[in-house]
Amino acid sequence: MDYKDTLLMPKTDFPMRGGLPNKEPQIQAQWDEKKLYEKILKKNEGRTPYILHDGPPYANGQIHMGHALNKIIKDMIMRYKAMNGYYAPYVPGWDTHGLPIETALTKKGVDRKSMSEAEFRELCRAYALEQIELQKADFKRLGVNGDWENPYITLQEKFEAEQIRLFGDMAAKGYIYKGKKPVYWSPSSESSLAEAEIEYQDKVSPSIYVAFDVLDGKGLVDDDVKFVIWTTTPWTLPANVAIALNKDLDYVQVRVNDTSYIVAQALLDNVCDAVGWDKEGVQIEKTFKGADLEFVKARHPFIDRESLIILGDHVTTDAGTGCVHTAPGHGEDDFIVGQKYELDVISPVDGKGVYTSEAGEFEGMYYDKANKVITEKLEASGHLLKLDFFKHSYPHDWRTKKPVIFRATPQWFASINKVRQDILNAIEETEFKVEWGKTRIYNMIRDRGDWVISRQRVWGVPLPVFYAENGDIIMDKAVIEHVATLVEKHGTNVWYEREATDLLPEGYTHPGSPNGVFTKEKDIMDVWFDSGSSHRGVLEARPELSFPADLYFEGSDQYRGWFNSSITTAVATRGKSPYKKLLSHGFVMDGQGRKMSKSLGNTVLPEKVVKQMGADIIRLWVMSVDYLADVRISDDILKQVSEVYRKIRNTFKFLLGNVNDFNPATDAVPYAELVEIDQFMLNKLYTFVNNAHKHYDNNDYLFMYQELQNFINVELSNFYLDYGKDILYIEAQDSHVRRSMQTVVYEVLTSLTKVLAPIIPHTADEIWSHTPHVTEESVHLADMPEVQSVDTALIGKWNHFLEIRDDVLKAIEETRNDKVIGKSLEAAVYIQAKNEEDQALLKSFDNLHQLFITSYAEVVDEPQGTDYNLSNVLVKHAEGEKCERCWNYSTVLTEESHAHPHVCPRCLSVLESK
């Protein structure tokens, strides 16, 4: 007889196959239709706010996996906070000014010189907004929940106005100044660069040793002696005005082939090796302390100019000669030491890297090509001691990938010195997940120079500065506020569309402009000043947000970028950090740990993965990686994640299928009346949920991923749900033992769905839509399951039982291999524990055979089988015949003539109760 229809088999419409690429857009359309983001905010209105401030990605180009990693973790954080009772608005942002957009337009064929600056800026604006729409669609497709209709954008008039006001506040406090100073300069971009825009790449440079003749030895050094310098930038020699020594080092005057030279004693051997001097033939004539040689004068090797001997702490014995070529116009250390000695700042190179008339005979030559010409000139005059070439790490423009130079130009600076200690104090008060994050930003602030905030471009926020006829700088607070008001109304193009007098307050006068003539600054602000002002233009400006934010979370490159500029401007103007906590993630590499690049063909694009596998697969991958370090992704890695997803989905299908006839309002069993194994599984669930809260709060998603797999695969699938089939399918529908188990299955189903909702939001909402008797229209409007106290004694008891059960499973497997049995229900188990406590534990169960998933189990007092870890186990083929309904073996089955033939007493009882 076929008893299939008498079994309570799982029933659910929840499909086995995810079909995420097609299903996710439908779910997202429902979210938009329901105005889910607004409903989530409404639900938590008036509760404790949690503010994660979005670091703005640059509005140019397709999003990559680094963007996906960043946005998905932010979304996981905010979805969890919202489900955990926080008012958690998420306002995405975009960074929109700067060179890449200008370059992108040029590549599209825009001829900048054929139009006005204002017209070119309009094209830049339109391009940026177009890019934002493309990126926005990609971010939304990843399931990122936020105020996408009202993002903040650095080109918005209100944002730009607040940025100008922030500049005004810093100027009023004396933190803004103009000076000629060597800055990182990119000839390929024709602009100065901030430290954050520099990346290091290998470069081959000339290495030359040059002799400078003594001009005035101050009675210490003879006139025919030469100082030896070493440099890898021969092109900077036209700007040389000094040679720096270290006051504490010993210097030696040595005789080599009838000529005397001065070098640091500690470097003499190195110099001999480098220039080819025979060490045996080198005679030390005199020894000096560096301090003794201060103010000795040398002669420039090819320009009629003195080169003063000065002292500087930056001179070391790490390399070179201990005598350092000093050009204040081309080096930061040179500039600093040069200020002390009031040296001329000579920088005879223009914005394109071409020598100016100040370079004399080299005028019109590109700086890099001058290396060869200058070296040849030195050789011809006998000043070149050695030329070599070597590969070293050299600063490059992070956008054009071309080398940069140090070049002294008139620039605007934000003083770091004046606020450095305050920023360091603010860092001390900031929370960091990892200590190295704190060390990194602390050291960067401690060691950084003043911040170059000017750029020689047009697409950006203008520096709101005017000049009087006599050259006086005008930075009055009232003037800057007037400009901010104009910008708030008309946007920053007003700066380019109006004359200086029309940008100043009506009737404005200045003693430096007797004729009422003014000019305006042409430079724009560094883009890091744009995004670094977002705490003012966004956190303080938007009513749903607040300053300081609870969290800033970006890639680890932002310690020198956005984290740095933000805390600098916030401390300078508000006296405190804009973030309470700082968290960072690593970079996304390929499966072998290599950087992704088109040339290697190893790029994995979010768009492609979403189309092939779905966004929830990318999100589950994000959960699975240690994001604090660099992470790896590849097709193989994503396939592994897909397998984990499939297992999760199958588990949910089973859970849903077994509560189709369960109503928690009428069928749930109180905890005290639950069958003990169900109490155990409920406590296991509580443990998982409690840990999930802890991991969410600590941003430890990898730990949660590992515990999730253990809970689903080991606790549920391998044990509880496997054991449960004999109850859920076989027992009477309304029996206590079945309702007890359904109570726990339902709790596992709803709790697990909620816990996973921030991770795989599409799948979680799909599960929720198939879950009977839930009241919320979306899982994202539900509350996270609460932290519960756990019965550790009960868990300990059952965990130990499961260890004994492992012995039984091994014995069953061995018996199956010996072909004694097939399925485990064909087995009868005879077990004796190795100690009295375990023996008593086994005897306390009245359904041991069910727990072993066998037809029979008996606790025996004498060992009959094989010794295992905790017990002695014998497995035989079960006696009797197979019940045609439950497939358990029984020695008592109904006869063929019975109304319900060939069933065991338990099944007969169930059938007769219907």
From Swiss-Prot:
Supply the PROSITE patterns for this chain. AA_TRNA_LIGASE_I
Per its record, what are the GO molecular function terms? aminoacyl-tRNA deacylase activity; ATP binding; isoleucine-tRNA ligase activity; tRNA binding; zinc ion binding
Q: Which InterPro entries match?
A: aa-tRNA-synth_I_CS, aa-tRNA-synth_Ia, Anticodon_Ile_BEm, Ile-tRNA-ligase, Ile-tRNA-ligase_type1, Ile-tRNA_ligase, M/V/L/I-tRNA-synth_anticd-bd, Rossmann-like_a/b/a_fold
Entry binding sites for ATP: K598
**'HIGH' region, short sequence motif: residues:** 57-67
The terms describing its cellular component in GO are:
cytosol
- Which residues are recorded as binding Zn(2+)? C883, C886, C904, C907
Q: Name one GO biological process term.
A: isoleucyl-tRNA aminoacylation
User: Any idea of its EC number?
Assistant: 6.1.1.5
Instruction: Indicate whether DNA-binding appears among the record's keywords.
Output: no
Quote the function comment for this protein.
Catalyzes the attachment of isoleucine to tRNA(Ile). As IleRS can inadvertently accommodate and process structurally similar amino acids such as valine, to avoid such errors it has two additional distinct tRNA(Ile)-dependent editing activities. One activity is designated as 'pretransfer' editing and involves the hydrolysis of activated Val-AMP. The other activity is designated 'posttransfer' editing and involves deacylation of mischarged Val-tRNA(Ile).
Q: Please state which protein family the record places this protein in.
A: Belongs to the class-I aminoacyl-tRNA synthetase family. IleS type 1 subfamily.
Q: State what protein this is by name.
A: Isoleucine--tRNA ligase
Q: Write down the species.
A: Macrococcus caseolyticus (strain JCSC5402) (Macrococcoides caseolyticum)
Taxonomy, top ranks, is: Bacteria, Bacillati, Bacillota, Bacilli, Bacillales
